[in-house]
């Protein structure tokens, strides 16, 4: 390896920049499903529920294979593991572009894509940020904000590719993005610890803490961790129920598709700004204050969506990207920092891994649940009202947990 690359490998700013670029690709991947949902339905005639089930397989398979990713990381290191996952992900998207049936779509995009998408997942990047930086929430925000820019840039570009060619060509473009951006950055920069600061091997007495069964036992035995687990399940469920149907919702409310896509793409920029702002806020004022602000904005977002079809003008919709970002952009950063405060350090990796499994399950369940409700009712208002009730519950639970952590003197 050239000497200048070896120097870059140990420069924290370079690690943060690499994380930002990898999350840019993640934003293009995750943020674009709302666009593919509409395009695949129009091309194939499959129902929204059928297509959304592919996203469910994608997220759930990624969550269920997270322990394998952790084992591979322990055995071979993050750089080799993430590089290998990138190749699997690119293969999955390439095969998805050839899918001619829902089952083929589930196997390619869902299973291979879901497993491989961990190559640019926030879990590993947030772990890197926590080990490399003294202000971890700010570092996490800098990395995670790349996904917002990725969504902002990718949605208009992918829409043009879909209109000029097809959704299949757009999936091939995402596969190329992963190979060109994620693969080299993961292989070069994604070391879990700075040189010379690697943790010592665990003592025999702590090996059991790395077991999934021990993690489940720790969660079951602690009321605080049980509530944290519930929040990890419900929060991504509500976010992705909304996020996967944004374009369809705005079109149903009477907005032209190009305007709807532009509005959703704008959330990429507002998420970028929101994550940076919340990272600094968490480091400065703690997770309770940040969580309360997030809760108010999330509820306001649902209120706006419910009111929009009833209004004579669509002008209030232009507040949506700002409200949506304040209400939802900081979820991963908040949860990671809450976990660092509430989980015993001796068992952190295993317990937080179980939390991320629940998080992935919530991501998997949200889109098909929303799609099934919309398909069954033929409308968006009743499903959105139900999502709003769940959203209110889990935000209240998180704020209570955060205040409890603050009373124990933690931030």
Could you describe each region identified by the protein language model?
Residues 109-145:
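Cytoplasmic helix-loop-helix junction between adjacent transmembrane helices
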Residues 24, 104-120, 233, 316-330:
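Hydrophobic core of transmembrane alpha-helices in multi-pass small-molecule transporters
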Residues 267, 271, 284-338:
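C-terminal transmembrane helical hairpin of 12-TM major facilitator-type secondary transporters
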Residues 143-194:
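Helix-loop-helix hairpin linking two adjacent transmembrane segments in secondary transporters
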Residues 33-37, 220-278:
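Extracytoplasmic gate region of multi-pass secondary transporters
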Residues 40-41, 72-73, 156-165, 250-251, ...:
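Interfacial helix-cap and linker-helix signal at transmembrane-aqueous boundaries
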Residues 65-77, 274-287, 374-375:
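Helix-to-loop junctions at the C-terminal end of transmembrane segments
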Residues 64-102:
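Conserved MFS/SLC helix-loop-helix module at the cytosolic interface between two early adjacent transmembrane helices
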């Amino acid at each position: 390896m050239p000497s200048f690359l070896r120097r870059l490998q140990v420069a924290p700013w370079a690690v943060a920049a690499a994380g930002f670029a990898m999350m840019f690709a993640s934003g293009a991947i995750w943020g674009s499903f709302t666009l593919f949902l509409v395009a695949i339905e129009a091309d194939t005639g499959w129902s929204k529920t059928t297509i959304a089930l592919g996203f469910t397989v994608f997220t759930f398979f990624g969550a269920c294979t997270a322990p394998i990713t952790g084992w591979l990381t322990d055995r071979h290191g993050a750089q080799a593991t993430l590089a290998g996952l990138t190749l699997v992900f690119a293969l999955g998207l390439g095969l998805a572009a050839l899918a001619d049936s829902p089952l083929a779509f589930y196997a390619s995009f869902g299973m291979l894509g879901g497993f491989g998408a961990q190559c640019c997942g926030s879990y590993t990047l947030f772990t890197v940020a926590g080990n490399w930086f003294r202000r971890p929430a700010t570092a996490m925000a800098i990395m995670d904000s790349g996904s917002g820019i990725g969504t902002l840039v990718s949605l208009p570009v992918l829409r043009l590719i879909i209109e000029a060619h097809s959704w299949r060509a757009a999936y091939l473009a995402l596969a190329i993005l992963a190979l060109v951006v994620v693969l080299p950055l993961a292989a070069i920069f994604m070391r879990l610890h700075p040189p010379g600061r690697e943790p010592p091997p665990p003592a025999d007495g702590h090996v059991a803490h790395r077991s999934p069964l021990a993690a489940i036992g720790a969660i079951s035995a602690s009321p605080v961790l049980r509530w944290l687990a519930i929040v990890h399940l419900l929060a991504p469920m509500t976010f992705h129920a909304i996020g996967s149907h944004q374009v369809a919702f705005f079109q149903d409310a009477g907005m032209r598709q190009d305007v709807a896509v532009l509005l959703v793409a704008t959330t990429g920029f507002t998420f970028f700004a929101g994550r940076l702002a919340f990272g600094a806020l968490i480091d400065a004022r703690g997770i309770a204050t940040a969580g309360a602000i997030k809760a108010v904005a999330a509820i306001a977002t649902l209120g706006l969506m419910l009111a929009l079809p009833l209004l004579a003008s669509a002008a209030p919709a232009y507040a949506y990207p700002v409200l949506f970002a304040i209400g939802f952009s900081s979820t991963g950063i908040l949860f990671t920092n809450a976990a660092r405060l509430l989980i015993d350090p001796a068992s952190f990796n295993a317990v937080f891994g179980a939390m991320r499994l629940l998080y992935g399950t919530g991501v998997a369940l949200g889109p098909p649940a929303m799609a099934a409700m919309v398909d069954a009712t033929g409308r968006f208002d009743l499903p959105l009202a139900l999502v709003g009730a769940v959203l209110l519950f889990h935000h209240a639970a998180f704020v209570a947990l955060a205040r409890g952590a603050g009373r124990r003197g933690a931030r």
